[in-house]
Amino acid sequence: MAKSASNQLRVTVRTETGKGASRRARRAGKIPAVLYGHGAEPQHLELPGHDYAAVLRHSGTNAVLTLDIAGKEQLALTKALHIHPIRRTIQHADLLVVRRGEKVVVEVSVVVEGQAGPDTLVTQETNSIEIEAEALSIPEQLTVSIEGAEPGTQLTAGQIALPAGVSLISDPDLLVVNVVKAPTAEELEGEVAGAEEAEEAAVEAGEAEAAGESE
């Protein structure tokens, strides 16, 4: 249920920085990273690209990493990822030093479970909420049930059950799930017709404006 410190990564200390050095590291299958926190000087590292991506894929960005830095163990969390806009590969990672027993603030995904009542439409307004938890006890996800929920049901962040030792940071009134009455076929047809009329009116207005400018 909770993250563990079993995500071992053997990392190397970067001896050179800059764009050129980062490109060379990525070509070698490494991910440039900076480790910071607890008042220490930022440390420039190279993470094993394949292993780090596997940790994120299987355990998520809230996974506690156990970094082996020149034989010394250091726990860390991923705080930010810089992703290539086209290739969608990790270009750089920002890591935060954490200690056993220390509490950290993180975002955790909210998963909706169950089947709402008949003739309802369910929308998830928020996909994640902020919580505070011990670094080694961050829940992988939080669940909220909509089983049998009727139209008008609204579930907020403050109504989500949290594990022991975990506290809510997000606004308790933050809307997470909204259940409304499903529109009828006639209502849907009316919405489509209204949208088409609005689009036609916008096109006509644009054509009239263009004609006026050309005169």
From Swiss-Prot:
GO terms for biological process: translation. Keywords: Ribonucleoprotein, Ribosomal protein, RNA-binding, rRNA-binding. GO terms for molecular function: 5S rRNA binding; structural constituent of ribosome. It comes from the Bacteria. Pfam families: Ribosomal_L25p, Ribosomal_TL5_C. Residues 1-10 have a biased composition (Polar residues). One of its GO terms (cellular component) is cytosolic large ribosomal subunit. Residues 1-25, 187-215 are annotated as: Disordered. NCBIfam families: bL25_bact_ctc, PRK05618.2-1. This is one of the proteins that binds to the 5S RNA in the ribosome where it forms part of the central protuberance. Belongs to the bacterial ribosomal protein bL25 family. CTC subfamily. Part of the 50S ribosomal subunit; part of the 5S rRNA/L5/L18/L25 subcomplex. Contacts the 5S rRNA. Binds to the 5S rRNA independently of L5 and L18. This is Large ribosomal subunit protein bL25.
